[in-house]
């Protein structure tokens, strides 16, 4: 949560309150809510419950719930709802550890994730993501200090088991089939109607001129030229025409997998042994954190 989104976030929360049913409850959590809970509570009122910290216990929001929200993968379908192309849209997001062993004065991690957890099994998260949203090219890991983990060798093995070992490649997922599958399942209809309209437009550019004309007219007849007029029912009916064309003209190519420890590695913990383990992965880029100038020598040695 960056400060320049503060007003917009508060407005969104207060807008959501208008739709709260009698006896219902709104929870607000995350970075800003954890760092400045009093300031946020003053803006949104006492009828909204602020959750401080992670949702890493099954009873955090509901005493009878068995789900650990922190271990669930993100809902990648929200990226299909927006026109902006998120730069990291073709990446899995996750953690293999939580927290940090350091307590740097400038850093909020010790407040956000105060207890260092040296292992989070990422394999199940990536499998769920692949089933719902297809394979991603990159693995963007948000660990704050992965090298501090005594289970670092196991973490590397987990990542390799997910297909991100050295020189690993993968076959692109069929975006149209995934979108149709999720639309049939009723999973975020808005997102997948919008995505399928975009895929129609991409397909049309690949078709021979005469076939492209027929496809356009068929879309027009079924009100499938624009997201605002398209309906789920019409898209599912139109699948009998669209599916064979996607199969014929959309080839599932191969790509190289890459891993990015996005928050950087702790230069003080770089050793020959853990660098040898990292070399078993397709790392790009390799980030080493440089947080204190007085540690310049340590940083240079790590490089």
Predicted regions mapped to residue ranges:
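Alpha-helix termination/capping residues and helix-transition junctions
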Residues: 43-45, 101, 132-133, 280
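Short, solvent-exposed loop/turn segments at secondary-structure junctions
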Residues: 5-9, 32-35, 55-59, 99-101, ...
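Conserved SAM/AdoMet-binding glycine-rich loop
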Residues: 127-303
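Canonical Radical SAM [4Fe-4S] cluster-binding loop centered on the CxxxCxxC motif
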Residues: 87-124, 128, 133-135, 147
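Glycine-rich beta-alpha loop elements in corrinoid/cobalamin-binding modules
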Residues: 1-89
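A structural signal for short, well-ordered beta-strand segments and their strand-loop junctions
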Residues: 27-29, 49-53, 93-95, 138-142, ...
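Soluble or luminal CAZymes and related metallo-dependent hydrolases
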Residues: 8-11, 88, 117-124, 151-154, ...
């Amino acid at each position: 949560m960056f400060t320049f989104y503060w007003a917009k976030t508060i407005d969104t929360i207060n807008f959501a309150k208008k739709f709260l049913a009698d006896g219902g409850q709104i929870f607000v959590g995350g970075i800003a809510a954890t760092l400045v809970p009093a300031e946020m509570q003053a803006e949104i009122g006492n009828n909204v419950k602020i959750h401080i910290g992670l949702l890493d216990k099954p009873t955090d929001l509901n005493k009878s719930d068995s789900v650990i929200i922190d271990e669930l993968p993100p809902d990648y379908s929200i990226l299909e709802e927006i026109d902006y192309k998120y730069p990291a849209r073709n990446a899995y997001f996750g953690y293999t550890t939580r927290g940090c062993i350091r307590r740097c004065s400038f850093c909020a991690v010790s407040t956000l994730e105060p207890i260092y957890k040296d292992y989070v099994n990422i394999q199940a998260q990536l499998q769920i993501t692949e089933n719902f949203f297809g394979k991603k090219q990159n693995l963007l890991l948000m660990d704050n200090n992965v090298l501090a983990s005594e289970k670092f060798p196991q973490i590397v093995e987990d990542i390799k088991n997910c297909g991100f070992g050295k020189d690993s490649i993968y076959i692109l997922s069929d975006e149209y089939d995934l979108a149709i599958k999720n639309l049939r399942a009723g999973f975020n209809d808005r997102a997948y109607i919008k995505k399928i309209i975009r895929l129609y437009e991409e397909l049309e550019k690949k078709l021979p001129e005469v076939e492209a004309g027929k496809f356009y007219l068929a879309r027009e007849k079924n009100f499938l030229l624009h997201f605002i007029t398209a309906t789920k029912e019409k898209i599912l009916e139109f699948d009998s025409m669209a599916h064979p064309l996607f199969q014929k003209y959309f080839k599932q190519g191969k790509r190289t997998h890459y891993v990015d420890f996005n928050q950087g590695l702790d230069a003080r913990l770089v050793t020959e042994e853990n660098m040898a383990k990292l070399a078993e992965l397709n790392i790009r880029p390799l980030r080493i954190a440089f947080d204190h100038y007085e540690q310049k020598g340590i940083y240079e040695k790590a490089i």
